[in-house]
Amino acid sequence: MMTIEKAMRTLRLPNPTTPEDLESRWSKVLTFGDRILLAGYYYNGIGQPSYFGAVYEHLDDDLSCEGTIGLRAVSEVEFEDDGHAIAWAIQQ
């Protein structure tokens, strides 16, 4: 698993943010219970896995798209597709 600080710097993941902001920046964002899951793409070289998963959690009582969320877990860039990245995020 990647550290939060490294993910923010390398993958340019915002922290804190809102679900609305994530959805405008990334194409694969899902609400899953009280968590927000993200599958992201980061070019890792020809023939290399280029997808990662990330998990955000609500930081306040506002569960709308404008509530504040914080980054809780990020995988390494290790998946060959976004489905496997989301599967990783679900298991966190």
Residue ranges, per PLM feature:
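Generic "edge-of-domain/loop-turn" microfeature
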Residues: 18, 60-62, 84
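Small side chains
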Residues: 7, 39-40, 53-54, 67-70, ...
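Amphipathic, interaction-prone secondary-structure segments
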Residues: 22-58
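A short, exposed loop/beta-hairpin motif centered on an aromatic-Gly-Thr core
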Residues: 66-82
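Negatively charged, low-complexity tracts enriched in Asp/Glu with abundant Ser/Thr
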Residues: 1-35
